[in-house]
């Protein structure tokens, strides 16, 4: 299925549409929200429309995808996003407007999308976070994801070196982790970052 609507206690997870463009722009233009993401903040509504067409509208034409707007039930206004890429990594990603941080909104959305992925027989999901983005790691742990390893990557288009932590959850009851998820990486074993083992 392609992004079937999901309901949680507080949220509706649904497809983005063109009526969301102003809220979409608010999400993807905020420097803090997009600090740890692989794109630059959007500059105007025209960029938002192009970004929406490229990353959402086009994939809604596919047979199976998970590309959600996170909305409150009370007003159905989009306040964030949550996606699963269906490449080899099955990478889970999310973002939320900063005024809604620290309310466990993303955790609620993650729980729902994991349940949907399991229902549709995805065997596993992975997720990564910049080592500096501690709160994203907390979301992954709370969702039952297990830390696998850390790696360093030269990140484009921002042209910076980033240390990532990779997590995985197996949805098929099997143990172990996916060793090759199709990225060029240097595994970092028993290294430290600011005194902490990564």
Predicted regions and their residues:
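Acyl-donor (CoA/ACP) binding surface of acyl/acetyltransferases
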Residues: 1-35, 69-198
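Polar/charged alpha-helical tracts
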Residues: 16, 46, 58-59, 158
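Conserved GNAT-fold acetyl-CoA-binding loop/helix
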Residues: 32-54
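Juxtamembrane helix-loop transition sites at the ends of transmembrane segments
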Residues: 47, 53-56, 120, 163-165
């Amino acid at each position: 299925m392609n992004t079937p609507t999901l309901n949680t206690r507080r949220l509706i997870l649904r497809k983005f549409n063109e009526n969301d463009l102003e809220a979409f722009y608010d999400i993807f233009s905020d420097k803090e929200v997009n600090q740890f993401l692989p794109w630059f903040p959007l500059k105007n509504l025209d960029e938002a429309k192009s970004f929406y067409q490229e990353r959402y509208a086009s994939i809604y034409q596919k047979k199976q995808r998970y590309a959600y707007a996170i909305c409150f039930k009370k007003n159905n206004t989009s306040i964030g996003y949550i996606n699963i890429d269906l490449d080899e990594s099955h990478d889970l990603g999310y973002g939320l407007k900063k005024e809604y941080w620290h309310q466990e909104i993303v955790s609620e959305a993650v729980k729902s999308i994991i349940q949907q992925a399991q229902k549709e027989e995805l065997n596993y999901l992975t997720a990564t976070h910049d080592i500096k983005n501690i709160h994203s790691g907390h979301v992954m742990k709370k969702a039952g994801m297990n830390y696998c390893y850390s790696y360093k990557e030269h990140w484009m288009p921002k042209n910076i070196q980033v240390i990532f932590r990779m997590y995985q959850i197996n949805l098929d009851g099997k143990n172990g982790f996916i060793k090759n998820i199709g990225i060029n990486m240097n595994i970092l074993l028993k290294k430290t970052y600011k005194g902490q083992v990564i």
